[in-house]
Structure formats: structure tokens, C-alpha cells
Regions:
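Short, amphipathic, aromatic/basic-enriched membrane-interface segments that mark the entry/exit
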Residues: 86-96
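Membrane-anchoring alpha-helices and their flanking helix-loop junctions
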Residues: 1-88, 102-165
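Short active-site segment of divalent metal-dependent hydrolases/proteases
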Residues: 99
């Protein structure tokens, strides 16, 4: 599909940018809410609080690694601009690793705060990302790449990384 000599491709900064901004804004507001209003839902057992904090740090660190591998390892900008479907490397483990990395980073930030109420937000983030991807990028990718993308999405998880099938 060509337009005036230029290839039609996904924007480098697409709907995901709005998702990421909303994600960080929600996480920041939730953090403020913990400080002012949600102290009653804090994890009070020291050993359990430690588990939350350690898990949060690990999840956030893995998210940063996932983002770095997704962006720099897969040369994502170059592939988008050249209208190439990326299916190797980390993209063999997860279809949307950049968005997943931001989701996991924010989940890690929420876990570190060790507050029971905040545990609902990663599920909300996952649901929002699923709906957003199904209604935008994945529709476009199916139209653009046809059966190649249909085969790819049948083998690779949308958000949760999993070894290739």
C-alpha cells in the first residue's frame, strides 16, 4: 500500500503514547491517594511488605530490560518506518513488548507501595491495553500483513511474555 511514493506504516508514536501517559498518570494519582487516603489498606505485616517491595523492584527491573531489548534490540523504529512485521527476538515471546514493559513498570511501582487496594490497577491496565490493541494496532496489522499477522497472533501472547510455541 503506497501513498504518493511513501509507504504507509504505523506511526512510531501511535495510540500507545496516550496509553503510556494515562498509565503513568494513574499510577502517580494512585500513589498520592495511598499517601492521603488509602493508608488503611497498607500491608502491615513486615515480612509480607518485604515480599511486595522485592517483587515490585524485580518486576520494574525486568520491565526496563524488556523495554531496552524491545526498542534497541529489535530496532523497532527502523522496522516500523520500513513497514516490517517484527516476529523475532522478544517479539517471538510477546506481541506488544514495549507496551507490556510500561505496564510491568507501573505494576512494579504499585507493588513497591505495598497497598492492597492498588493490586487492582495492574488488572485494569491489562484490560485497557487489551481493548486498545484489539481496536487499533492489531486491526491495522491484520489488514496490512494479512495471514502473516494472523498466524503470528495465534502463536504469540499479546501482553504476557511466554516462550515461543
Amino acid at each position: 500500500m503506497e501513498t504518493r511514493g511513501e509507504r504507509v506504516h504505523l506511526p512510531v508514536f501511535g495510540v500507545g503514547t496516550a496509553y503510556v501517559v494515562a498509565l503513568f498518570t494513574t499510577t502517580a494519582l494512585a500513589s498520592v491517594a495511598v499517601f492521603f487516603w488509602l493508608g488503611w489498606a497498607a500491608v502491615n505485616l513486615n515480612w509480607l511488605r518485604l515480599i511486595f517491595v522485592v517483587a515490585g523492584v524485580i518486576v520494574a527491573a525486568l520491565a526496563v530490560v524488556m523495554w531496552l531489548v524491545s526498542v534497541f534490540g529489535a530496532r523497532v523504529t527502523e522496522n516500523i518506518e520500513n513497514n516490517q512485521l517484527i516476529t523475532g527476538g522478544i517479539y517471538a515471546w510477546v506481541r506488544h513488548p514495549i507496551y507490556a514493559a510500561f505496564l510491568f513498570l507501573n505494576a512494579g511501582i504499585l507493588l513497591v507501595q505495598a497497598n492492597y487496594v492498588l493490586l487492582i490497577l495492574p488488572a485494569v491496565y491489562w484490560l485497557a491495553l487489551t481493548v486498545l490493541m484489539k481496536r487499533t494496532e492489531e486491526r491495522w496489522l491484520r489488514r496490512q500483513f494479512g495471514q502473516q499477522y494472523v498466524d503470528y497472533e495465534s502463536c504469540v501472547n499479546r501482553i504476557m511474555p511466554w516462550p515461543p510455541r
